[in-house]
């Protein structure tokens, strides 16, 4: 399954291995512009941007889209994608505690490991 990345972040190696493709060039620049709101958006602004992002996904030929970002945009984007027959996926990751020795000191950090996708069908 081809999954278009509709987030502002580059797909991880694990996500790429599962079929995620990042937008490139002008399409990526357009996506970032559409995902970033300057000032308080109206419902019309949100709806229009969701429609335009879904159009980018449709033009890519992807069967599914990995989405994430502003919570007020996601329901609109989900509907716009589903209206075009594009499956909606959210990345699911687990927090993994990692200990490393740095200069003789144990440093504990948390890393997020991609596990898979949650498909939203409502």
Language model regions located:
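Gly/Ser/Thr-rich loops at beta-strand to alpha-helix junctions
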Residues: 66-75
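Long, low-complexity, Lys/Arg-enriched
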Residues: 1-62, 76, 83-122
């Amino acid at each position: 399954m081809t999954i278009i990345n509709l987030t502002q972040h580059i797909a991880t190696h694990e996500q790429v291995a599962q079929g995620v493709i990042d937008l490139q060039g002008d399409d990526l620049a357009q996506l970032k512009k559409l995902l970033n709101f300057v000032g308080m958006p109206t419902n019309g602004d949100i709806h229009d941007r969701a429609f335009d992002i879904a159009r980018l996904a449709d033009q890519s030929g992807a069967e599914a889209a990995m989405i994430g970002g502003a919570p007020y945009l996601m329901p609109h984007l989900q509907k716009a994608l589903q209206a075009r027959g594009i499956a909606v996926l959210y990345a699911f990751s687990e927090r993994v505690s990692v200990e490393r020795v740095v200069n003789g000191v144990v440093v504990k950090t948390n890393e997020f490991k991609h596990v898979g996708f949650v498909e939203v069908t409502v």
